[in-house]
């Protein structure tokens, strides 16, 4: 048997209410009982909805965690990260190679300058003892600075263009 209220039980309750309350107060009392039952159902429904909402939020948070985990485990992102690292490494290697080449060029130029000065000193020593007058020292310094200037800034000469070519005629 089901524990619900059937038709015979409902008739017994109505007859008792009629006897206890009376025929005049019965409609008012039934209205109040109906309102109380509606409030009880509304409260039960709100309670049930709040539990369902908590369940949905929990499911959504779990789904979000799974999506984030999948995004992090995405092989495309891993490959992209590895390619970025490789590109940075290649750029660093290129920069190091250029710096090393520049240092070697500077070292070669410095060695060439030292060799040229040593050759000049050897040539001066082979000419014999010279007087160390200020005029002789000034001439030697001027010759050395002229050689350095020629090596430091090679001058390229280009023929002048006629005015007609410049204006586009």
From Swiss-Prot:
Pfam families for this protein: TatA_B_E
Membrane topology type: Single-pass membrane protein
GO molecular function term, any single one: protein transmembrane transporter activity
GO terms under cellular component: TAT protein transport complex
Range of residues in the leader sequence: none
Entry's localization field: Cell inner membrane
Ranges where the record places region Disordered: 106-169
Keywords annotated in UniProt: Cell inner membrane, Cell membrane, Membrane, Protein transport, Translocation, Transmembrane, Transmembrane helix, Transport
InterPro entries in alphabetical order: TatA/B/E, TatB
GO BP terms, alphabetized: protein transport by the Tat complex
Membrane-spanning parts: 2-22
Quaternary structure and partners: The Tat system comprises two distinct complexes: a TatABC complex, containing multiple copies of TatA, TatB and TatC subunits, and a separate TatA complex, containing only TatA subunits. Substrates initially bind to the TatABC complex, which probably triggers association of the separate TatA complex to form the active translocon.
NCBIfam families on file: tatB
Function: Part of the twin-arginine translocation (Tat) system that transports large folded proteins containing a characteristic twin-arginine motif in their signal peptide across membranes. Together with TatC, TatB is part of a receptor directly interacting with Tat signal peptides. TatB may form an oligomeric binding site that transiently accommodates folded Tat precursor proteins before their translocation.
Family: Belongs to the TatB family.
Protein name in UniProt: Sec-independent protein translocase protein TatB
Originating species: Maricaulis maris (strain MCS10)
